[in-house]
Amino acid sequence: MRIGLRMGAEIWALLALSMLGVFSGSVVAVEHSRGQKLFLPVYSEVAYGDRRAALNLAVTLMLRNLDSDQSIALTRVDYIGANGAVVRSFLTEKHGLKAMAAETFVIRESDRTGGASAGFLVEWESREPVLPPLVEGVMVNGAYNQGMAFVTSARVLAEKP
């Protein structure tokens, strides 16, 4: 019986080590870019229960300049409704983002203008090739003494030449 337990522990240890190898080997070199057009899907409400009730969510666009040396410029941050139309433009001019700095844009929980399947179009540029920014959406609701949160990541639609 003791031998069986020991072999089981060894198997678990080997499995854990192999998983570490898989995960540590999955790091990929990131290409540098001079600019991108990105789409970030966000969800301002989710259905729940048998009656298809909707739970409203606050949405935060989180944009982080990951380059430790170069600034980037945000040239477009538009909130896009479920119908594909621009609901709100957050920028009227270029907005600089220093190296390693972050910026947030918020859609309040009570704001229903985008519909359930809204999104953001984000465009940025840089004079020199840089690490692309990290662009994520965080959706949160804390109703009924329970927390609910979702995170989405942006998709690249186009690279600046």
Language model: regions and residue ranges:
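Sec/Tat signal peptide C-region and signal peptidase I cleavage site
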Residues: 23-29
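Short, hydrophobic/aromatic beta-strand segments
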Residues: 70-77, 88-90, 132-134
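A structural motif detector for short, solvent-exposed N-terminal "entry" segments of globular domains
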Residues: 32-56
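Short, solvent-exposed loop/turn segments enriched in Ser/Thr/Gly
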Residues: 53-60, 118
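Bacterial N-terminal signal peptides
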Residues: 9-22
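Intrinsically disordered, low-complexity Pro/Gly/Ser/Thr-rich segments with frequent PxxP/GP/PP motifs
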Residues: 81-119
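Terminal connector regions
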Residues: 111-161
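Asparagine-centered strand-capping/turn motif at beta-strand->loop junctions
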Residues: 63-70
